[in-house]
């Protein structure tokens, strides 16, 4: 869900997008359940990559690790691959990220970003190598790093109280996201429900429409930024995890400037602790 950053190749943006949208949750607390998922990534209906996630989650904490790589037709563009790791807590029905790290590697460049947060405020960011700054980039302010979640925390959808997990409460929200370089909102709106079947899960998912709203750190005149800000063809399907009262992405569909990218689970399972 990133706008184009300077110096980032298409293949690296594809990996970053895949990892950011895969953001599935887990945690290292007592009585943790183990969550595993495998995703296929397609562009224009053609397979271009795969992604795997594994982690643990509970009512009050999460940890996730995911990796993605281009394959099949995707290797005709690049041999890009990436990995992401994140930790945090769920407090009073709200996600409170603690750490976020992502590495994206292409044929000529590997970039690593690490970020720490406390109380939904960014306490540190390290990007190596750093992005080249551009004069047309909207400057980041201190307030752009407060009251935010990282791209992984953005897709850990917690539902407080007794609201049904698969219903409007899953979607009707605005999520403030800081990815270490840009600040944007994700505005979710409830569309309805669907029934899905994959290895490990068969049941309902909440369908949410998503709008990307750039706030700071982006380059407003870039075609990719304008396209995403006007994009009305972004959708996420969220599967429930009743024990933790969270929902996780089952399927993500994003129209891009070169066609629609779909990330969909072929395996999605929760193993309860014993």
Where are these predicted regions, by residue range?
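Internal, conserved structured core segments that host functional sites
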Residues: 107-151
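Bacterial N-terminal signal peptides that target proteins for export
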Residues: 2-18
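Short, intrinsically disordered, low-complexity terminal/loop segments
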Residues: 1-2, 274
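Cleavable N-terminal signal peptides
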Residues: 18-20, 30
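Long, charge-rich C-terminal accessory regions
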Residues: 155-161
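N-terminal signal peptide c-region/cleavage motif recognized by signal peptidases
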Residues: 25-27
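Acidic, serine/threonine-rich low-complexity disordered tracts
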Residues: 31-119, 164-274
């Amino acid at each position: 869900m990133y706008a184009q950053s300077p110096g980032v190749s298409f293949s690296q943006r594809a990996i970053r997008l895949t990892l950011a949208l895969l953001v599935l949750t887990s945690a290292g607390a007592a009585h943790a359940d183990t969550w595993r998922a495998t995703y296929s990534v397609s562009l224009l209906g053609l397979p271009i990559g795969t992604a795997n996630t594994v982690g643990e989650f509970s009512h009050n904490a999460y940890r996730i690790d995911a990796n993605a790589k281009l394959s099949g037709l995707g290797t005709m563009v690049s041999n890009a691959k990436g990995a992401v790791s994140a930790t945090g807590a769920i407090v009073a029905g709200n996600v409170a990220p603690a750490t976020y790290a992502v590495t994206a590697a292409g044929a000529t460049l590997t970039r690593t970003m690490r970020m720490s947060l406390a109380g939904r405020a960014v306490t540190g960011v390290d990007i190596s190598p750093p992005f080249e700054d551009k004069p047309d980039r909207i400057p980041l302010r201190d307030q752009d790093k407060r009251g935010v979640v990282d791209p992984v925390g953005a897709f850990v959808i917690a539902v407080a109280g007794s609201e049904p997990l698969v219903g409007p409460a899953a979607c009707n929200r605005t999520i403030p996201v800081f990815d270490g370089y840009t600040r944007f909102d994700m505005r979710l709106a409830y569309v309805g429900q669907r029934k899905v079947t994959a290895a490990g899960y068969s049941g309902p998912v909440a369908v949410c429409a998503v709008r990307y709203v750039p706030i700071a750190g982006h380059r407003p005149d870039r075609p990719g930024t304008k396209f995403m800000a006007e994009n009305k063809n972004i959708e996420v399907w969220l599967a429930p995890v009743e024990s933790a009262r969270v929902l996780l992405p089952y399927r993500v569909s994003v129209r891009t400037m070169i066609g629609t990218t779909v990330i969909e689970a072929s395996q999605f399972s929760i193993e309860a602790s014993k």
